[in-house]
From Swiss-Prot:
Effect of mutating residue 1181 to Q: In CLIFAHDD; uncertain significance; also found in patients with neurodevelopmental disease and hypotonia; uncertain significance
Ranges facing Extracellular side: 58-65, 130-137, 200-269, 290-294, 404-416, 469-472, 531-543, 564-569, 907-915, 973-980, 1040-1104, 1125-1129, 1228-1236, 1294-1296, 1358-1378, 1399-1420
Outcome reported for the amino acid change (mutating residue 484 to Q): Does not exhibited altered current kinetics
High-level lineage: Eukaryota, Metazoa, Chordata, Craniata, Vertebrata
Species for this entry: Homo sapiens
Listed GO biological process terms: calcium ion transmembrane transport; monoatomic ion transmembrane transport; positive regulation of synaptic transmission, cholinergic; positive regulation of synaptic transmission, GABAergic; potassium ion transmembrane transport; regulation of resting membrane potential; sodium ion transmembrane transport
Protein name: Sodium leak channel NALCN
Length: 1738
């Protein structure tokens, strides 16, 4: 998938300039600068410089004063070194003069700038040491550029052997694509920013105590927690008694104190929208909006914002990065290297018997030096028993380490049983390593990378068992033993190797990420280290943690908000832009790079893809052969076929045993034969056939089959001979024409892609048919012998591929036949086979009735009685939807939906058991499902029938859901205790929405796509679990019992942790109020408790795994980090950072990569080669292309024509786009009736509205109303402008809040039209729209899963008490609220905290033994399973499917002019030509006009009639054949051109290739026949002319008799088809046409030539002349010069019968040619707008 965009050009150019580090010149004066050690020293100095600048902060010097002098010394040294290097380079290169002077080299300028920054930093530090400049002054910001010197350290690794032009092109294209998507993102940010301003405005109304006075707002004035409210009584939240709703801005709070997030004006609004789109803190914004404004506004705004911005638009960003960097990665393949094999080149492989008795390939190094161990030990060491013993010991060691737990404070930790076990295992693995070294020798042992890893573990674990180092950082070596277990599973080992590929690729990305983090941390450090009240950037470790936190997105908004508050109001916008740009780059581009690399590693090599396609086809054929196991079970029973029973014969006669099926076949055959025999007799045929069981049509079919069998062998021989002969004649003609040099006089011209592909096909077929004569092209000598040989080999390979394809096709047919035969045999030999429930007969009336009911479906597709083609009706999409499933399934879908709606009204306080109204839907569902299942079982059987109800997982699920519903309905328990069987039954009942998955075929497909790739997802899960286990074991050994602390921060020791203390309460996260003198924050007294953190601990492996699973989702890891640093030590912060980096960068991107790869594999795109993938993209792109909805320019040069020119001018379009943007800017502040600024803004909007009215009027005048209405965009503009006019009238009449709201709505609707005016925006919007359309069923599937979990959540957690995150907004008290909470969890917003709130257990809650709705306790095990499974399924798998679909659809629009297939320019050119031909804008043209269309095409689609006559004939005949001379659509012609423009051998897949080749062979044969027929007619003409010349004397003698006979005789005509009476009647008209050359007759239909016209509908049943069958005209008659004006009109569809051409053919052709030329020029000037805005009309 990712390699399909690589450029096909190979440039042989010198490698790129490496920058200033290469050798400057051989005769340089200063030689030391060229030494390699100097380059290495300078690179090390660059790293030292970064370290120095990271230490250079006031806080660091305060903690470690000597560092001030250390940094000064280092900087002085570096300054001298780099200055010397700069002077030396200037001396060698020259400063300004010369091509390679110092100033002209970019790298040299960069190095010089770094030296300048170093000087500035040093001078500044001198002033700081001398106390002339304060260390906390902003002058320190001058050091900001210094960390960029890190680039010098890694510049050496950017040496790539690629031509400079190639790199420039790649970077240019990448930049263009990223810029385009940035514009797209900006469009949506602007849209939602405007909507936010107008829908919400400010969030400044809060609940405050009644006695609050202006200027005296403190923490104690606010509600706890701080609550937003609405001043309007009907909407939002109303404050409780004792509080009033007040605007805090009116009470004197500044903007800085109120916080920066909100929708006050457009700038703040865009900032807030970006924060929400990062899915961090968006839900709290929504809750504020719900409290302040009407509820529906908040839900609509924020849910659509998350869906479009966070999921769709941002994923388009990921798609762009994957696509643009795909080409870079392909070019850098030389630098990264390809995946080599697992064994080294020095090793060979041999078969070895494994433990299970099978054989496996084992690498054996023949050159490996043998150790000194005895042979028996060497044999033992190589045995599989020894290997499995060691792995089993590793497993036991891992289990023992995982069993460790915290045993209490008083337990002696040094020498417990776990320590002794660790010592024993360490000794065992030390002995294993010594044995291997003894057997292999140290050199042989160390040569394997696996042995190096084992030796590292042995040394580390040996040091670890030393008592002082036990429970230290050396524990890593112990827990890393688990990695050795990957060797147990070969599948897992291969998968790991495939994903991580060559270490260079992923390793270079990790190094790049780490370097970026260090550089950005150092920059931020120097930017903010002097800011007071900001402790996040005081030292380098703190700065690094903050920037890393932004990279992972967890709490990044808090980092930004704290910094904004600290820097003050003036610098806040600059700081916000800095953090947003860093966040954008880190989260989108950097993470996308990891996904792209993993996808590239999962990509198959090109040469393997076609092989895999063939193998897959073979495998499919093999699987189709076998019947399912449930049917094969009948083969175990003895055969008991049904015998003939004759009831009326006496017992004296013995009836032979004859199978009933044989007797039936015999009787049927006899009746058929008798009927057919009697039919041939003259008299009795009708009477005898009346008594026959078969109809006349069936008899005809039977005779037809008999005849076909009889002539089959003769026909097969004749067909082959005929095809070979015709092809040989055609190829010989082509070669003769090429050799005769018929094209000598014409200038050389670049051939079109159609011509190139046509000649490729000709060459291929000529070789395939065994034509061995030499092919000599014009102007070239004979081919050399080697080239001939390579051609022969190539075409032999093609022949072999052909035979493979045919073999697979035959195999498929045989498998299908075999399967049918097996089924028929079982049906015949086993009387109970295919009998539902072993009771209902196979052909029983009741079963047939059930079948009719079950399989009845809506079918509105009408077929043409003549052609058999399906006609598209007006509402065919609606009809297709109705025909999607059967009527019975539609009924069940409706019943299931109604039942789910009824379940939505259930809650713990309104239960189905006690609410009769809710039971109605329950009864209806069970009754309808009973009827449905009974009908289906009677029609198709339950289990042991071919089409049984239970034949897959869906059937099992149906029966399960039915049984659960039935049991619940019968039982209907009145009291349901918590955690009981009845509650479990209620939870299982919540699976009811999953029925829709089974009923809708597309939903089943989604599930299939999900589960067919389950193996890879399972392997990724194992890898992540292994990673978690390693870190969990380490965490238990280091942090068990150490995280517990007293809740009073002033108490350090456990024995002092008693009594009570006052704890402060957190009031608000958003407000930044400062405490007044003497004021205390609100708080209350609580007892002191020594306890673990609330949400996590590392006291045992289970709890540690849960904590790390939450961290893996990047939620809550900041709290874990802070607790570990605060309670164990700062050095242990490395632990959680390493885990998050591995989990976030590699673990989660692995999930994304694997889900995308599986999606492609299931869709069949993973195995597609580059060419096949491009072809699929092209087909999808052409599907959504439409004809230009642009009417033609008016004929004359009058007023309308001038208007047309003005409205179509690019300047006019850009002006209108700017006016739309200008009007949208008017919505930068909220339009409020009470605000005085609203009136002038509305007045300006009125002016803009009148301008747009003028624009629409001009367009209507220019295009005419009918022409204007053709374009959907014009219709949309007209609608918006009409609404604008209505608004202007209402605004001046009423002038109230509603008119202002309507005005804002009109402007927002107008803002949408920007997308249509910008090509890139339109393309990307189409990507999103097409992705939404294609992912519709995935989104529906997500919603159904959400619904199931919501219903279950109401049952399990409906009454849980409020906690940290379960509150009045987020709870499970009803299905609606549960859906909102689950949608929040999908975005990952604090899902782990909600889970812990739902785990609450006594004594922190009130239990109840009898009913679950009377308790406010949670369910620990239920919450664990519920939330973890939901988060994994939705967030890790389903959302990544959305990414996969968007990545796939984006490739449709990632088209460049370098692409070999049809580009946008080609498509645009075709649209313009189509508009010329389809002058009525109907989207269809008659078949005869296709010739005219093809002749007008230019550029890459041009068909040169002089060189490619045959191709032209093929294309015209293809259109006639496929559409039977009827109308052809825009897409029909485009599809034909696309097939002709590609090499079908490379681009088409198996089935499509076979069908296409068959069609092309047929067309070729038919055209050949027509060509021969026309040639024969010409020969006959010549013969007749000669005969007439030789018989001129006789002719003159009989002239008088001839004149009298001419009125009775028709002129002779040579026809292959029998002419109808109507044709004979019109023969006079036909004979009046003048005789023209054969080329004009076949290939050059002029505008007046009616030869290609369609016949009328009345002639549909009559035999038509095929393409190329031209009647010989009789002797020419005098031609009158009168001509109908209709004939000169291009769009006229007059048939041959209605209009007769009566003018000179040469004059006619010339006049029409000049008219077309004028028309072509006019259309080209008007319609070739450089903006390409109508390329794809939405």
């Amino acid at each position: 998938m990712l390699k399909r965009k690589q450029s096909s050009r190979v440039e042989a150019q010198p490698v790129t300039d490496f920058g200033p580090d290469e050798s400057l010149s051989d005769n340089a004066d200063i030689l030391w600068i060229n030494k390699p050690w100097v380059h290495s020293l300078l690179r090390i100095c660059a790293i030292i410089s970064v370290i120095s600048v990271c230490m250079n902060t006031p806080m660091t010097f305060e903690h470690y004063p000597p560092l001030q002098y250390v940094t000064f010394t280092l900087d002085t040294l570096l300054m001298f070194l780099y200055t010397a290097e700069m002077i030396a380079k200037m001396h060698i290169r020259g400063i300004v003069k010369g091509d390679s002077s110092y100033v002209k080299d970019r790298w040299c300028v960069f190095d010089g700038f770094m030296v300048f920054c170093l000087w500035v930093s040093l001078v500044l530090q001198v002033f700081e040491i001398a106390d002339i400049v304060d260390q906390m002054s902003p002058w320190g910001m001058l050091r900001i550029p210094r960390p960029l010197i890190m680039i010098r350290a890694f510049r050496i690794y950017f040496r790539f052997e690629l031509p400079r032009t190639r790199i420039t092109n790649i970077l240019k294209r990448s930049g263009e694509q990223i810029w385009s998507v940035s514009i797209f993102l900006l469009f949506f940010l602007l849209l939602y920013g405007i909507l936010g301003v107008q829908m919400f405005g400010t969030f400044t109304y809060h609940c405050v105590v009644n006695d609050t006075k202006p200027g005296n707002v403190t923490w104690n004035s606010l509600a706890i927690p701080d609550t937003h409210c609405s001043p309007e009584l009907e909407e939002g939240y109303q404050c409780p008694p004792g509080f009033k709703c007040m605007d805090l801005e009116d009470l004197g709070l500044s903007r800085q104190e109120l916080g920066y997030s909100g929708f006050n004006e457009i700038g703040t609004s865009i900032f807030t929208v970006y924060e929400a789109a990062s899915q961090e803190g968006w839900v709290f914004l929504m809750y504020r909006a719900i409290d302040s404004f009407p509820r529906w506004r908040s839900y609509f705004y924020f849910i659509t914002l998350i869906f479009f911005l966070a999921w769709l638009v941002k994923n388009v960003f990921i798609a762009v990065i994957i696509e643009t960097f795909a080409e870079i990665r392909v070019q850098f393949q030389q630098m990264w290297g390809s995946r080599s094999s697992t064994t080294s080149t020095a090793t060979t492989q041999m078969f070895h018997e494994d433990a299970a008795g099978g054989w496996q390939l084992v690498a054996v190094d023949v050159n490996k030096p043998q150790g000194r161990a005895p042979a028996c030990l060497q044999k033992m060491m190589r045995s599989s028993v020894f290997h499995m013993f060691i792995l089993s010991m590793v497993t036991v060691d891992v289990i023992v380490a995982a069993s460790n737990y915290y045993k209490g404070e008083n337990f002696r930790r040094q020498y417990d049983e776990f320590y002794l076990a660790e010592v024993a295992f360490t000794v065992l693995f030390d002995l294993e390593a010594l044995l291997k070294i003894w057997c292999l020798g140290f050199t042989g042992y160390i040569s394997s990378s696996l042995h190096k890893f084992e030796l590292l573990l042995v040394i580390g674990t040996t040091l670890h068992v030393y008592p002082d180092l036990y429970h230290s950082q050396f524990t890593y070596f112990q827990v890393l033993r688990v990695v050795r277990l990957i060797k147990i599973s070969p599948a897992l080992e291969d998968f790991v190797y495939k994903i991580f590929g060559p270490g260079k690729k992923l390793g270079s990305l990790v190094v790049f990420t780490a370097s970026l983090l260090i550089v950005m941390s150092a920059i931020s450090l120097q930017m903010f280290c002097f800011v007071e009240e900001l402790d996040r950037f005081t030292t380098f470790p703190r700065a690094f943690m903050s920037m890393f936190q932004i990279l992972t997105q967890e709490g990044w908004v808090d980092v930004m908000d704290q910094t904004l508050n600290a820097v003050g109001h003036m610098w806040a916008p600059v700081v916000a832009i800095y953090f947003i740009l860093y966040h954008l780059f880190a989260t989108l581009i950097l993470l996308s790079l990891f996904v792209a690399v993993i996808l590239d590693n999962l990509e198959l090599d090109e040469d393997l893809k076609k092989l895999k396609q063939l193998k897959q086809s073979e495998a499919n054929a093999d699987t189709k052969e076998k019947l399912p196991l449930r049917l094969r079970i009948f083969e175990k029973f003895p055969n008991r076929p049904q015998m003939v029973k004759i009831s009326k014969l006496p017992s004296d006669f013995t009836v032979p045993k004859i199978r009933e099926s044989f007797m039936k076949q015999f009787i049927d055959r006899q009746q058929q034969d008798t009927c057919c025999l009697l039919r041939s007799l003259p008299t009795t045929s009708s009477s005898s056939c009346d008594h026959s069981k078969r109809s006349a049509i069936e008899d005809n079919k039977y005779i037809d089959q008999k005849l076909r069998k009889s002539v089959f062998s003769i026909r097969a021989r004749n067909l082959l001979e005929k095809e070979t002969a015709v092809t040989k004649i055609l190829r010989a003609c082509t070669r003769q024409r090429m050799l005769s040099g018929s094209f000598e006089g014409q200038p050389a011209k670049e051939r079109s892609i159609l011509s190139v592909q046509h000649h490729i096909r000709q060459e291929r077929r000529s070789l395939r048919h065994g034509s061995n004569s030499q092919r000599i092209s014009r102007g070239k000598s004979l081919e050399t012998l080697t080239q001939d040989h390579s051609n022969t080999v190539r075409y032999r390979n093609a022949q072999r591929e052909d035979s493979e394809i045919k073999m697979i096709q035959e195999k498929k047919e045989q498998a299908e036949m075999k399967r049918k035969v097996q089924e028929e045999e079982l049906r015949e030999n086993h009387p109970y086979f295919d009998k539902p429930l072993f009771i209902v007969g196979r052909e029983h009336r009741f079963r047939n009735f059930c079948r009719v009911v079950v399989r009845a479906r809506f079918n509105a597709s009408k077929t043409d009685p003549v052609t058999g083609a399906v006609k598209n009706t007006k509402y065919h999409q609606l009809y297709d939807l109705l025909g999607l499933v059967t009527y019975l399934d539609w009924v069940m879908i409706i019943v299931t939906i109604c039942s789910c709606i009824s379940m939505m009204f259930e809650s713990p306080f309104r239960r189905v058991m006690h609410a009769p109204t809710l039971q109605i839907a329950e009864y209806v569902f069970v009754i309808f499902m009973s009827i449905e299942l009974n009908l289906k079982i009677m029609a198709d059987g339950l289990f042991f029938t071919p089409t049984a109800v239970i034949r897959d997982f869906g059937g099992v699920m149906d029966i399960f859901i039915y049984l659960v519903s039935l049991i619940f309905l019968c039982w209907m328990p009145q009291n349901v205790p918590a955690e009981s069987g009845a509650q479990l039954l209620m939870v299982l009942r919540c699976l009811r929405p999953l029925r829709i998955f089974k009923l809708v075929p597309q939903m089943r497909k989604v599930v299939r796509e999900l589960f067919s790739g389950f193996k890879e997802i399972f392997l990724v899960s194992i890898l992540l679990l292994t990673l978690m286990l390693v870190f969990a074991s380490f965490g238990v050994q280091l942090f068990a019992g150490k995280l517990a602390k007293c809740n009073d921060p002033n108490i350090i020791r456990r024995e002092d942790c008693n009594g009570i203390f006052r704890i402060n309460v957190s009031v608000s996260k958003n407000l930044n109020l400062k405490l007044r003198p003497g004021e205390k924050k609100p708080g209350f007294w609580v007892p002191r408790v020594w306890a673990n953190p609330r949400n996590f601990n590392f006291d045992n492996v289970g709890n540690a795994m849960l904590a790390l699973f939450e961290v893996l989702s990047l939620k809550g890891w900041v709290e874990v980090r802070d607790v570990i640093i605060h309670r164990v030590g700062p050095i242990h912060g490395i632990y959680i950072h390493v885990f998050v980096f591995l989990g976030c960068m590699i673990g989660l991107t692995l999930f994304v990569g694997v889900v995308i790869a599986n999606f492609n594999e299931n869709k069949g795109t993973a195995l597609l080669t580059v060419d096949q993938r491009r072809w699929e993209d092209l087909k999808s792109r052409l599907k959504i292309a439409q004809p230009l909805h642009l009417p033609p320019r008016p004929d004359n040069d009058g007023f309308r024509a001038k208007m047309y020119d003005i409205t179509q001018h690019p300047f006019f379009k850009r002006t209108i786009a700017l006016l739309v943007l200008a009007q949208s800017v008017l919505l930068s502040v909220k339009w409020d009736v009470e605000d005085p600024v609203t009136v002038p803004l509305a007045t300006m909007s009125v002016v803009f509205t009148f301008i747009f009215v003028l624009e629409v009027t001009m367009k209507i005048i220019a295009m005419s109303p009918a022409g204007f209405w053709q374009s959907r965009r014009n219709r949309y503009d007209l609608l918006v402008t009409s609404l604008g006019v209505v608004w202007v009238v209402l605004h001046f009449a009423l002038l109230n809040a509603y008119t202002y709201m309507m005005g804002a709505c009109v402007i927002v609707f107008r803002f949408f039209s920007i997308c249509g005016k910008h090509v890139t925006l339109k393309m990307l919007l189409l990507t999103v729209v097409v992705s939404m359309y294609k992912s519709f069923f995935i989104i529906v599937g997500m919603f159904l899963l959400l619904l199931c979990y919501a219903f279950a959540g109401v049952v399990l957690f409906g009454t849980v008490k409020y906690g940290e995150n379960i509150n009045r907004h987020a709870n499970f008290s009803s299905a609606g609220k549960a859906i909102t909470v689950l949608f929040r969890i999908v975005t990952g917003e604090d899902w782990n905290k909600i889970m812990h709130d739902c785990m609450v257990q006594p004594p922190f809650c009130t239990p109840d033994e009898f009913t679950y709705w009377a308790t406010d306790c949670g369910n620990y095990a239920g919450a664990l399973m519920y939330f973890c499974s939901f988060y994994v399924i939705i967030a890790y798998i389903m959302l990544n499917l959305l990414v996969a679909i968007i990545v796939e659809n984006f490739s449709l629009f990632y088209s460049t002019e370098e692409d070999q297939l049809l580009s946008y320019n080609d498509l645009r050119h075709f649209q313009i030509i189509w508009n010329m031909v389809d002058d009525k804008r109907e989207g269809v043209i008659p078949t005869f006009r296709v010739k005219f269309l093809l002749r007008l095409l230019r550029g890459r689609l041009e068909v040169d009639l002089d060189k490619d006559k045959l191709l032209f004939k093929h294309m015209c005949y293809e259109m006639e054949r496929l559409h039977n001379g009827g109308d052809v659509t825009f897409h029909d012609v485009l599809s034909m051109l696309s097939y002709r423009s590609v090499d079908i051998r490379k681009s088409l897949q198996l089935e499509e290739l076979l069908a296409r080749e068959q069609l092309e062979y047929t067309i070729e044969e038919e055209v050949a026949k027509q060509t021969i027929r026309m040639w024969l007619k010409k020969c006959l003409k010549r013969i007749r002319a000669k005969q007439q010349q030789s018989c001129s004397i006789i002719h003159s003698l009989r002239e008088s008799q001839q004149q009298e006979l001419s009125r009775f005789l028709n002129p002779p005509s040579i026809e292959t088809t029998q002419p109808s009476e109507d044709t004979n009647a019109n023969s006079q008209d036909n004979s009046m046409q003048p005789e023209t050359s054969s080329q004009q007759q076949l290939l050059s239909p002029t505008l007046s030539d009616r030869g290609g016209s369609r016949q009328d509908a009345a002639d549909a049943g009559k035999p038509q002349r095929k393409f190329g069958q031209w009647r010989l005209p009789s002797a020419p008659k005098p031609i009158s010069h009168s001509v109908s004006s209709v004939n000169l009109r291009f769009g006229g569809r007059t048939t041959m019968k209605s209009v007769v051409c009566k003018m000179n053919p040469m004059t006619d052709a010339a006049s029409c040619g000049s008219e077309v030329k004028k028309w072509w020029t006019r259309q080209l000037t008007v319609e070739s707008d450089e903006s390409g805005d109508d390329l794809l009309d939405i």
